[in-house]
Amino acid sequence: YADGTYPVISMTDGVVEQMGWLPLGGWRVGIRSDNGIYYYYAHMDSYGEGIEAGARVEAGMELGRMGSTGYSDVEGTSGNFATHLHVGIYIPVEGQEDLSVNPYYLLRYLEGEKVTTAEYSFEELPASQ
């Protein structure tokens, strides 16, 4: 992409639960899936059209653009590291903090399938994968 950013694509259907600036994560968006799983995308450059707290999103929808924001208390700081996307997946556990799940295998699956927009949400991945 000419501007040096890449699209950030939602891995799930759900609702934008949180977004905005975090000192470490920079511009970020958090999606709560219909099954309660929380998907976290951080270090974003910008948000996509219509992405706001409470908005409904679908798997494959562009959430915004990948960037290098964060690692500063100064809102909007970027360039302290290379452009990348920090992805977190958190499964709710009754009576405890959400369980952090390594997104590696989901991302490998999507990469292996050459998926450019998510064809499956995390909850719908074939059992054989």
What is the meaning of each model-derived region?
Residues G14-V16, G54-T69:
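A structural signal for short beta-strand/turn segments enriched in small hydrophobics and glycine
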Residues Y41, L63, H86:
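Short alpha-helical segments in extracytoplasmic peptidoglycan/chitin-binding modules
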Residues R65-D73, I89-V93:
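Short regulatory "switch" loops immediately downstream of catalytic or recognition motifs
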Residues N80-Q129:
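Acidic, glycine-rich catalytic/binding loops that coordinate metals and/or anionic ligands
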Residues D3-T5, S10-A53, V74-T83:
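Zn2+-dependent peptidoglycan hydrolase active-site motif and core
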